[in-house]
Amino acid sequence: MRLTQMPSEFQKALPVLEKIKEAGFEAYFVGGSVRDALLHSPIHDVDIATSSYPEETKQIFPRTADIGIEHGTVLVLDGDEEYEVTTFRTEDVYVDYRRPSAVSFVRSLEEDLKRRDFTVNAFALDETGEIVDLFHGLEDLEKQVLRAVGVASERFNEDALRIMRGFRFQASLGFALEPETFKAMKTLTPLLEKISVERTFVEFDKLLLAPFWRRGLASMIESQAYDYLPDMASSQDKLNRLFDLETDFTFESSEQAWAALLWALEIENAQSFLKSWKTSRQFAKQVQDLLIILALRENGELSKRDCYRFDIDLLLQAENLRQAQGKEVNPQAITEKYQSLTIHDKKEIQINGGILIKEYGYQPGPDLGEILTEIEFAIVDGELENNREAIHAYLREKK
């Protein structure tokens, strides 16, 4: 099969392919970018595979960087563009179900493609637009099927993260998992405990943000993979609550997706849960804030102080999630209340602790903090104007 129209992303990278071929080596576009081109989907990263060894690749191009040379990858700088150029390779026995004990560089494209995870990710594309399809990936693409390359159990034993990647690809593509492939995934889910939490988080996060997240999540639940994810053992019934969200709902952000997950799991302490997933503190705080906003909305409308406390983006994401839960929402009222606030940060207050100490004789300590907080909320509540004269009058009354 030949592409009738080479996508612009590939056209831009053609000079790199051509230089490698002029030097006497093979070179192809490979991986997800080729699949996306066939599906007429946006192309993100253009990866190149070649028969040239890393040192040979570096001799072809004047500007390169070693970013993973032990695995055969050289970063080629071409004008303003950067391309990862990786030598065809085979991989030895995997250790810890995560990484090969050794990588061997080879001159054979077929040997390289054999180690790929799924047939729809095992294409190669040459400079003429010809598709190299050694594992019937085009047929699987047509049938919308995710099938492991070769023996499925071997692929997942090599790198157990491929199990999560399978669920994630199902969520992003909407494809069905081929029965033998899914059977192997279900059998080998205990291996997920061998995978770093950070890598697992990335795949689960991409699954939740994908357009067909329901399909990927349903397969993950059926496989009982959740039993081997941090703090999610025996959570099938609770995870199924996510399917109660509106049928066409997709998550706006990672924070919203994980807030929904914790809502489904009935977990109130996001910081503790997400610490197990080794996320950033900032991410955990925003997820926690979303859960707090959802809880506040269960008790009625948000107050001015509520709107002041949280970022408007989080307030609206929480409202969006409430709508997906089938609850009454009023994003316009929340936006108007937020915009009506005199201040959105205490740094905007026209006085500070230094002024209170200098002009009013306050001493550093709890009393100073209390009066500053009192002023802050009086301004937020609309009871006090945010100017020095009004604040001074307020303080004189207090004195």
From Swiss-Prot:
Its EC number is 2.7.7.72. It catalyses: a tRNA precursor + 2 CTP + ATP = a tRNA with a 3' CCA end + 3 diphosphate; a tRNA with a 3' CCA end + 2 CTP + ATP = a tRNA with a 3' CCACCA end + 3 diphosphate. CDD domains: NT_ClassII-CCAase. It comes from the Bacteria. Transmembrane segments: none annotated. Mg(2+) binds at D45, D47. It is an enzyme of class 2 (transferase). CTP binds at G32, R35, R116, D159, R162, R165, R168. InterPro entries: Bact_CCA-adding_enz_type3_sf, CCA-adding_enz_C, CCA-adding_enz_firmicutes, NT_sf, PolA_pol_head_dom, PolyA_RNA-bd. A single active site specifically recognizes both ATP and CTP and is responsible for their addition. Belongs to the tRNA nucleotidyltransferase/poly(A) polymerase family. Bacterial CCA-adding enzyme type 3 subfamily. Catalyzes the addition and repair of the essential 3'-terminal CCA sequence in tRNAs without using a nucleic acid template. Adds these three nucleotides in the order of C, C, and A to the tRNA nucleotide-73, using CTP and ATP as substrates and producing inorganic pyrophosphate. tRNA 3'-terminal CCA addition is required both for tRNA processing and repair. Also involved in tRNA surveillance by mediating tandem CCA addition to generate a CCACCA at the 3' terminus of unstable tRNAs. While stable tRNAs receive only 3'-terminal CCA, unstable tRNAs are marked with CCACCA and rapidly degraded. Homodimer. PANTHER family: CCA TRNA NUCLEOTIDYLTRANSFERASE 1, MITOCHONDRIAL. This is CCA-adding enzyme. The gene is cca.
